[in-house]
Amino acid sequence: MARRYDSRTTIFSPEGRLYQVEYAMEAISHAGTCLGILSSEGIVVAAERKNVHKLLDDSVMTEKVYRLSDNISCTVAGITADANILINHLRWWAASYRNSYGEEMPVEQLVQNLCNEKQRYTQIGGKRPFGVSLLYIGWDKHYGYQLYQSDPSGNYTGWKATCIGSNHQAAVTLLKQEYKSPNLEEAKQLAIKVLWKTLDVKLASEKVEMAVLTRRDGKTVLEELTTKEVDALIAEHEKKEKEAETAEKK
């Protein structure tokens, strides 16, 4: 019976479900883990690099954190080709707003624009939803630092900390337990802790990309952490884990 409805993007099933949207969300659940953590001093994002191969050229590897404007960036989980189309839309809207009004586009307004476009693709026959979720990070003069998440249906929500991609439910559960209004350094350590406990592989610097969005001298700055900095965070977490194990044995 379900086959009557799951091949059509625009038809609801008798249970009130849009199967194609659900399938798009399922595709995202198999993508690399991406998480964002809001702190009092900025925002930390961390994204898993999946399918790392020793023959891949690091200089041309697909990035996981994308700059959209001077004040806004994002990370994605899902079908990369779909993400590239949406990122181009986001950059065009942000640039058009800046050219028209002489200031940066508010973060939530940019998110709303894209979600309107994503929702439109759930109502057009002959097209499919975009198989990608995004985490948006940014700063504006209205609300300061902001973290948003959107899914293929066009829904978006604001978060203090969240995760998309594989193992996202376990990661969100851990974030609920551990998030306590951290500063920037604590947010970095929390990101490493969550990835350490939820990834299916041993955490290493070549398997994760981390970036920090902060304000400096009146400007928004997005800095990607170097391999050495990520290694240091992982080593610090390993040390804490060993100390905790030793304390439990005593």
Swiss-Prot record:
Pfam families: Proteasome, Proteasome_A_N. It is found in: Cytoplasm; Nucleus. SMART domains: Proteasome_A_N. One of its GO terms (biological process) is proteasome-mediated ubiquitin-dependent protein catabolic process. Its main location: cytoplasm. Keywords: Cytoplasm, Nucleus, Proteasome. GO terms for cellular component: cytosol; nucleus; proteasome core complex, alpha-subunit complex. InterPro entries: Ntn_hydrolases_N (IPR029055), Proteasome_alpha (IPR050115), Proteasome_alpha-type (IPR023332), Proteasome_asu_N (IPR000426), Proteasome_sua/b (IPR001353). PANTHER family: PROTEASOME SUBUNIT ALPHA/BETA. The proteasome is a multicatalytic proteinase complex which is characterized by its ability to cleave peptides with Arg, Phe, Tyr, Leu, and Glu adjacent to the leaving group at neutral or slightly basic pH. The proteasome has an ATP-dependent proteolytic activity. Belongs to the peptidase T1A family. The 26S proteasome consists of a 20S proteasome core and two 19S regulatory subunits. The 20S proteasome core is composed of 28 subunits that are arranged in four stacked rings, resulting in a barrel-shaped structure. The two end rings are each formed by seven alpha subunits, and the two central rings are each formed by seven beta subunits. The catalytic chamber with the active sites is on the inside of the barrel. This is Proteasome subunit alpha type-4.
